[in-house]
Amino acid sequence: MTLWVLGLNHQTAPVDLRERAAFAGDALPRALESLRALPQVSEAALLSTCNRTELYAMAEEAHSLVNWLETHAPGLSGYLYQHQEAEAVRHLFRVATGLDSMVLGEPQILGQVKDAWAVARAHGALGSGLDRLFQQTFSVAKRARTDTRVGANPVSVASTAVRLAQDSFARLNESTVLLIGAGETIELAAKHLSEGRVRRLLIANRTLAHAQTLASQHGGFALPLTDLERHLAEADVVFSATAAREPLVTRVQVEQALRARKRKPMLLFDLAVPRDIEASVGELSDAYLYTVDDLERAVEDNRRGRREAADQAEAIIDLQVARYVETLQATAHQAPLKRLRAFGDSTRDELLAKARQQLHNGKPADEVLEQLAHALTNRLLHPPTAALRDAALNNDLELTAAADRLFPEKPGYQHPPHSYPDREDR
């Protein structure tokens, strides 16, 4: 089996394609079950965030994985990147460290990679190969973030959106802000907003208890998601990041809210993939809609500022990839050595037991020892002898050269006048 990673991200695919490729909620376990049912796949894990969908697998080939992704989201094959073996290892190390993120060094991605590993493990999709890779990934990401400043003063998509809101509304502390969702992105937005102060903070979520917890931490007011439309007109700024499969905020709802606000502008940040806010909302006058793709341009300055630290992290990753591949190769080479040792041990034990029985039956010791020596020689040398004969017939120079390296002819060696037959003496 070969290690593969196939995926698309904010650099290779637009948001409308990424949202079709995303796996949210219960779709993730079902997708893993479907993947594991493929005869070419032995292990699999899926990483799905607002900026990327990636499939990690131990598989015979990549074609079946591409076909599987195409079945899930038709039309994405032209946007996919594909890595195998060492380059797949490097890619995962870079992703978990934040080097492949829209916001360079952002810390949330490591938690998302851990979540992907945990879900795959919980649903029996991981074997020793991928499990070992993810465990090593967590160690490498931790070291890269500890030994460099790639994660210093982290800037997230949420904090970038809040900064844009502050730039757009000179008096954000006199504004009403509506947060939709209660996940990590919205938690970060709430944290940054409460640090900068807002006049009123509304938090709407499908599970009211989660909204209430977040509201109590940041001085906000919790709303059930069913009340969203009723309170939309109160919001000067909206941040939305849920796992909904369909938009929660429609063009019609925003039009109604703008009329109720007497055309007072609204600023909306859709931080979700799939999108929470209908794209056509951005066509409305007095409604200013930003998606995660729009925010990528806003974080480019941050990316340039962290490049030196990122270069240091890349060097750490290069070293760790080399070490990981060396470990895998050493492990792979141990398997035939273990089989050879097991063959020798079982042959010895079998023939020794036979010799002891012959001694017990009164057979002369010298005769038993000679037969034991002949039998051991013939039994142990029969497999390589047969393989070398086949190699000679098939002109397999690689195998014959390996035999020469394993059994070099010693200077002054004289071939015996006869050799024992290539069979076990009875």
From Swiss-Prot:
The keyword Nucleotide-binding belongs to this UniProt entry's keyword annotation: no
Q: Which residues bind substrate?
A: 49-52, 101, 106-108, 112
User: Positions of the site: Important for activity?
Assistant: 91
- Write out the catalysed reaction: (S)-4-amino-5-oxopentanoate + tRNA(Glu) + NADP(+) = L-glutamyl-tRNA(Glu) + NADPH + H(+)
Q: EC no.?
A: 1.2.1.70
Q: Which residues bind NADP(+)?
A: 181-186
Q: Where is the active site?
A: 50 (nucleophile)
Q: Which GO terms describe its molecular function?
A: glutamyl-tRNA reductase activity; NADP binding
- Which pathway, metabolic or otherwise, does it act in? Porphyrin-containing compound metabolism; protoporphyrin-IX biosynthesis; 5-aminolevulinate from L-glutamyl-tRNA(Glu): step 1/2
- What is the top EC class of this enzyme, as a single word? oxidoreductase
**InterPro entries attached here?**
4pyrrol_synth_GluRdtase, 4pyrrol_synth_GluRdtase_dimer, 4pyrrol_synth_GluRdtase_N, GluRdtase_CS, GluRdtase_dimer_dom_sf, GluRdtase_N_sf, NAD(P)-bd_dom_sf, Shikm_DH/Glu-tRNA_Rdtase
What domain of life does the native source organism fall in?
Bacteria
Tell me the Gene Ontology biological-process terms attached to this UniProt entry.
protoporphyrinogen IX biosynthetic process from glutamate
Key words, A-Z: NADP, Oxidoreductase, Porphyrin biosynthesis
Q: What residue spans carry the region label Disordered?
A: 405-426
Entry's free-text remark on domains: Possesses an unusual extended V-shaped dimeric structure with each monomer consisting of three distinct domains arranged along a curved 'spinal' alpha-helix. The N-terminal catalytic domain specifically recognizes the glutamate moiety of the substrate. The second domain is the NADPH-binding domain, and the third C-terminal domain is responsible for dimerization.
* Role: Catalyzes the NADPH-dependent reduction of glutamyl-tRNA(Glu) to glutamate 1-semialdehyde (GSA).
Stored HAMAP family: Glu_tRNA_reductase (MF_00087)
The record ties this protein, via PANTHER family, to: GLUTAMYL-TRNA REDUCTASE (PTHR43013:SF1)
Quote the record's miscellaneous comment.
Answer: During catalysis, the active site Cys acts as a nucleophile attacking the alpha-carbonyl group of tRNA-bound glutamate with the formation of a thioester intermediate between enzyme and glutamate, and the concomitant release of tRNA(Glu). The thioester intermediate is finally reduced by direct hydride transfer from NADPH, to form the product GSA.
Q: How does it assemble?
A: Homodimer.
The UniProt entry's sequence similarity note says:
Belongs to the glutamyl-tRNA reductase family.
Q: What protein am I looking at? A: Glutamyl-tRNA reductase
The protein's gene is named hemA
